[in-house]
Amino acid sequence: LAAISSVSKIDLLTRAQGAENGVRLHLEAGKVLSEEPVGCPCGTTILVRELFYNTPARMKFMKSDAAESSAVFSVVQQQALAHPEISFRFLKDGQEQLHTDGQGDRMAAIYAIYGRELANNMLPVDGSWEKLRVRGFVTKPTATRGNRAWQSFFVNNRYIKSRLLSAAVEEAYRNQIMVGRFPACVLEIDMPVQAVDVNVHPAKTEVKFLSEREVFDAVHYAVLSTLSRAAGRP
């Protein structure tokens, strides 16, 4: 938020739980230009306007409105899956594209984001391996997709991209799906913070695991156990 405020104009409205009044702030280029008490609901609303207005060179690298909107939508989807306890609402050109209920049910978030057909073809995953726990959902072998865009991984509630985790999931489906088809999944891996380094990529979407073999095995066997139970195999 600090980085965004340094290159935009921001109107912020916030009130803490139990506070009598809220506060309205107006910032430009990271500087607070006005601050005043106001009556408002609990929570925080942030309006960002004129992004990169003071850095025209950066503005030249902005993609089309459609591309930038798609990128923002993707981030909102990731956060909605990582935090089903928070309600997310995304509007584009005044039209609601996504609304999650914030009731803490990850399946409800999956339903809101990916739709009924995918949600109805997912199996729950919950397995432990050493100090790791793997939770979430994977699709049945009969409900695969044509690419990996439907795979979402979270480590300690942080969205990441990981070939290792994709490989672990796909290995569990070996001989169960056709070549060129991929399982969809939403998986959360909980692990000790010292077991993962999140500072290997500027966007922090790539991580380095202290023990890749252990992480691979934890995810692989958790998913394999789910598929075996669903198929009636011991």
Model-derived features with residue positions:
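N-terminal phosphate-binding caps/lids of nucleotide- and nucleic-acid-binding domains
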Residues: 1-234
